[in-house]
Each structure stands twice: as C-alpha cells, then as structure tokens.
Amino acid sequence: GANDAIRADQVAANEFKPEAKWAESYRQAGFGAVNAHIADGLARGSSVLLAPLGPETPAAIEAHHPEGPGAQRFILRKESGAYWSFEKGSSTQDYPSSLMGCIALLRQTLYDEQWYRGLGKQRDFTDLNLDNIGRLSGLPQFFVTNNKYDILRAERIAKEFNRSFIYKGSGEEYMYLDAVRALGRPVVLPLRFPEVPDLSDPVEARRIGLGSLVHWDQAPANAALLRKAGVPIALTSNGLDKMDAFAAAVRKAIAAGLSFDDALAALTTTPARLLGMDSVLGSIAPGHYAHLIVASDTLFKADCEIRTVWIQGQAYPVKPWPATPTMASGRYRLQGDLLA
C-alpha cells in the first residue's frame, strides 16, 4: 500500500501564503528570488520559485497575473524543481524506521514508477505519487543531504535510475572532497557554521572531540575548497536562524578563501542556471527581470549596507542613504552587482 513518507504529490505553490515579514527579511538580505519546497518526506514534490514582493502591487506585475493580487503575483515559476531526501518526515507509519529502510523505500518507489509508467494505456488505476514522480522528472532534481555520506548514497540511486541530482549539501563536503569532485554534480551549500566551542570549563572541554574542533575550523572553507576542486556550487540561506545573519555568513566564507566572484556567482548566475531560469534571472541583461541591488559599497564588504532592492522593476528601500546637505555635481560611474 501507499506510504506517507512518499509525498511526490505535494505542490509547494499551492501551500504558499504571502507573509509580509517573510518577504521583507529576504529583501533586506538582498534576495530578488527565493526557491522553496515543503521539507517533508522522502519524495517531496515540487518547489516554487518566488519573488519576495512587498505589499505594493504595481500594474506591470499585476498584468502578468490576471488572477488578482493574491499569492500568484509572488510566483515566478509554479513548479521549479523536484525534491528528494533520506528523511521520513512527518509520516506516523512505522515503516521506514531507519536510514536503510528509507533508502529501500525510495528505491522501491522509483522501481514502482518505472513499472507504472511502462503500463501505459493498459493501466486501469491511478497513483498520484507515481504520476507526479514521472510528471516532475523533466524538472531539476534536488536531493537534500544531512551529512557527508548522503551524497554518495544518493548518487548510487541516481546511477541506478538514470537520474541527475543537484545536491543540497550538509556543510561537510570538504571531508570527502575527492569523492564529491568525482561525481561532477553541483552542490548547494548551507552557510550555517558551527558555533565557537566553549572551552571555559576544563571538564566540558575534554568532552569536545577533535573532529568537532576540526569541523569548527574547516567548515567556513567548505565553499572555497569545493570551488578550487572545480565543483559547481550555489549558496543557500537555508539553515540560518535569521536572514540578517546571511551577509556575515557569506563574508565568513570569503574570509576562508572563497573569491568574491565565486560567491557572487553562487548567488546569482549559478542558481538561475540550475533552476533553468537563466534566461530571465541571475544577470543584468535585456529581457531579464529587473532585479537589482543598490548598496553603499561592494557587496559583502564589512561596512557594505544594502540601500535599495529592486524586484521586477519595483524599488524597495532597505536603509536610507545618509542625509547630505547638497548634491555634488560632476561625472559619475554606475556600478552594480545583482543578487537574484
């Protein structure tokens, strides 16, 4: 029978409800587009690509969504990707009760989908989960991992079923750098790094293992090490407690060796390409969405402040410029970085 850990019929766009604070937090961090999915189950259905718009509804945006000024105007692409994981999620069924069981159920489901698809017109029943696994197979396939081993486990499934996964990393990829590089697959990296170990209590300090200390030291360099190894990367805010910690986390990755250009690409052109949206997102070009950032300095510098974020041609003030008594005349050069 059906297993509740298989939720391929979930459509994140159908569950999205606009929240002003949610949208504002992403705008203040400089985001013009956000990819979101329902993080529940082994097969998680489709994600939605959203624009974190404000309460204003410009006519130009409204014209694209004749349904009205509701959630639709936030949606850049209703189904932007299919998501998978080794996590059972909220299912209350006994099975699966282990990682091995999760892998077995995922493989069995993919075999079932192959059989179901092969029946063609002879099929006299409908299975929504299997229908949706097949229907979503043409979208980018994202696999969410939780540790350094999950990518290797998931890649075996990818080869078994002739799939290509984009991996949402755990932050531990540097530990298996050669193996990850050999896969040749993109990795979306989190920016949540370990807290500084508390060594003030000698007794507690003895319980902190060497592995924990090494991970605390090396985790910020994860992105830099993968890029130097030639692994395509994107960066995600997923895992951060607050969006206002995002810029500091990127700065930490840059301080650990990630170049500014690689950091910028990992937040603009690369994610747009992975989502198949690079014809309208990720760079400043004719025909692209007018998503721009106006900042006081080069992005991610310690003293850089985002002043205005433009989304679909609509300006959203973030922090006003300091008041100046006069306007200085002269010739100026406009220079900008795009954060999609």
Residue positions per predicted region:
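Anion (oxyanion) recognition and catalysis
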Residues: 27, 159, 181, 227, ...
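Polyanionic/metal-chelating signatures
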Residues: 19-174, 305, 311, 328
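Short, charged, surface-exposed secondary-structure boundary motifs
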Residues: 61, 176-179, 196-203, 319
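Glycine-enriched alpha-helix->loop->beta-strand junction motifs that scaffold or abut catalytic
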Residues: 158-164, 181-188, 230-232
